[in-house]
Amino acid sequence: IGRADGGNHDGHARRRAQGLVSRDDASRLIVFCNNSGPAFIIGAAGVGVFGSASAGFFLYAVHILAALIFGVIICPKAPCDICYDEDIFSPVSFSAAFTASVKRAADSMIGVCAFVVAFSAINGVLDAMDITRSIAGELSYMLGAELSWCAALLAGILELGNGIGSMTGLAISPINLALAAFILSWGGLSVHFQTFSMIAGTDIKTARYMIGRFLTALIAAALALLGAAAIF
């Protein structure tokens, strides 16, 4: 579920390019296998934001459950089209495999850092121009929510880390945990553009990916809202 799979969208793209999976299966994979790890959710979101490991474990459980529920929804009876053509797998020397893996890992790492920095900068510019505050104010008026809550939502839509970090100081409550669950499952536009860069050149459907992440985030928020009301 992302962690077990490694969240390796570059790997999904290569498998699709090699014909190992169908386009529909690859499109499902990038939605389903795109989740935050337990260290970030429990440590950064739970302990760092809410000062509670219990809240972190709760958010992680909601995060995984939402992914599982969405996975069942999108392919309840979908066939798994896997190619077992042995000709696709050719022997490679250890030195060549090691060199290629290090290069691909470095490229992915640089790409991830670049998108995080870019969207953090965009977030900073929007804050400096008071655009975020203005939009948050409108949302606060329409939804009847706190200004800081709306500002965190907007930050989380752009970049996951900034969104979760913006929630620091908010109390443990169903509505705040629901917001954290939404941001964690949505992932942020920064993560989405990282995914797009990895699957570029393939026929994997990006529209399904965006819709899937948004629906998963809504499921997570609903689960957190209901669960937190009973637990916290």
Locate the predicted segments by residue.
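Alpha-helical membrane segments and immediately flanking helix-loop junctions
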Residues: 1-50, 153-170, 177-202
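C-terminal transmembrane helix pair
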Residues: 39, 64-68, 173-232
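Intrinsically disordered, low-complexity non-transmembrane regions of multi-pass membrane transporters
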Residues: 78-104, 137
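Helix-coil boundary and interhelical linker segments in multi-pass alpha-helical membrane proteins
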Residues: 47-56, 170-174, 229-232
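Transmembrane helix-loop junctions in multipass membrane proteins, especially transporters and channels
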Residues: 52-53, 71, 75-83, 128, ...
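Alpha-helical transmembrane segments
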Residues: 55-71
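Transmembrane helical segments that form the transport core of multi-pass membrane transport proteins
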Residues: 102-180
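Hydrophobic alpha-helical transmembrane segments in multi-pass membrane proteins
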Residues: 40, 67, 71, 108-120, ...
